[in-house]
Structure formats: structure tokens, C-alpha cells
Amino acid sequence: MSNVTLSDFLLIVLSFFVPFIVVGIRRGFCTADFLINICLCALGIPGIIHAIYIVIKYPRTVRLDIENSPNDPLVRYTPNPEHAVSPHSGPAPPSYSSLASNDNKHQSP
């Protein structure tokens, strides 16, 4: 058990009480590992063994804050240029009254 951190140790201890929660924390609650562990928990001991296996096999991943990383060379901020309003050329569109001149409620035969 190399590179077992304090959080891994606490998850292993917690897996003796609620192993499916440990698998949900480590792998996600909508994953196949979570559903497998729920089925194994019905059998008892295999659910605990599976939860300990998941904690050891999949170490905690470090989530990087990509948006607020000032030293990352792959993330560059480029400001958008000001959008200039182009002059409108051509005739004005027709008004609604010229398009809908007759009343649509009364239809003539």
C-alpha cells in the first residue's frame, strides 16, 4: 500500500461501514463501479473488499483550476476587439401595417 494518504486511510476505514458511499466518493455515484459495489454489498464482505480495492487502485486525482491558472502557457487570454457598428445599407424593411393590411379575424368567402 504505497502512497496511501490520510484521506485514503479514512476512506478505507469508512468502507467497513458504508462501502458503496466510499466507491461513490472515489469513482462517482453514476458509474458501473458504484452499481457493482451496491450488488456486492448485498453479499456482505465482497462489497468491503471491492471498496478497499477502488480506494487503492484509483488514487485521488488533483483537480486543477484551469481558469485561474496564471502560469499555464496553454491558457492565454486574448481580449475581443471592439465590434464596430457597420452602417446599414439598403432600403428599410416594410412595416407591419403594410404586410398585414387586412384583418385576419374575418375571412371573406
UniProtKB/Swiss-Prot annotation:
Q: Where is this protein found?
A: Vacuole membrane
Whether ATP-binding counts among this entry's keywords is: no
**Chain intervals for the UniProt region annotation (Disordered):** 75-109
Q: Which UniProt keywords apply?
A: Meiosis, Membrane, Phosphoprotein, Transmembrane, Transmembrane helix, Vacuole
Point out residues bearing the modification Phosphoserine: S69
Q: Where is the signal peptide?
A: none
* Membrane topology listed for this record: Multi-pass membrane protein
Q: Which GO terms describe its biological process?
A: meiotic cell cycle; monoatomic cation transmembrane transport
Protein name, entry field: Plasma membrane proteolipid 31
Q: Which organism is it from?
A: Schizosaccharomyces pombe (strain 972 / ATCC 24843)
